[in-house]
Amino acid sequence: MIERMIQMQIRNVNGGYSKEEYNRQTSGVIPQILIGSGARKKYSYDDEKKTYTDTISSVEIDAYYPGLGVQVIKMPGDFKIPKGLEDLSEIELIDPEACVVSRKLYVKAKGIK
């Protein structure tokens, strides 16, 4: 399986997560979920011990934005992909936000409707 897919093109550089930045970068395109092997768990990092903990801080999913490319979306740690949702199904993100750091787009949301 290909580890990384084409990342979405960045339109401009801006700071901080916002709904406006998400709308600016996606131009109203409806994303499609790429289920693959499911949501990937991201664990908290203990700066003092310099190691990862057993605490899940977030999960990541991949979504395809037709005409734009593939984007990783950060979800809350307790997020689960809804049962019955098929690969490449159109999804609606709950409270999506985006930010641009060094021309790289980061997207987060609270869930999927």
Protein language model features and the residues they cover:
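OB-fold and OB-like single-stranded nucleic-acid-recognition modules
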Residues: 1-113
